[in-house]
Amino acid sequence: RGAKAMGIHTALDTSGFLGAACTDAMLDDIDLVLLDVKSGLPDTYRRVTGRDLQPTLDFGRRLAARGIQIWVRFVLVPGLTDDPANVEAVADYVAGLATVTRVEVLPFHQMGRDKWASLGMRYELEDTPAPSPELVERVRDQFRSRALEVY
């Protein structure tokens, strides 16, 4: 709370799943939210996260209604989040949030693989390739077609 009073820019990095737990007072102290939207379709979201999509959608709308700047991040995972209908659903949702100033399409990579092994856990995406440059551009274009600033 004191950071903003000292003129320090404040940011929250979140999937939005627990956004309902943020009080209005907490949100008053946030300048920017990095909102990870992992899917626009409930079934795909559940497959990716094991959770419901609605809390993320609700939190994004709440942020926009409060005038809080949002940067949306979308992780592009071949065979998981790359379906055109899924990307369209995310892009439509994001385009409806007036305070989104940036969309980052983040190509999937394997840099976290060792973390799973060190935890003794099976890594479900072990055989998943990085998306091709053409796929990344297709997805970015889907967001750009809605006049969004895309990186």
Short names for language-model regions:
Residues 92-95, 101, 117-142:
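A structural motif corresponding to the C-terminal lobe/cap of the Radical SAM core domain
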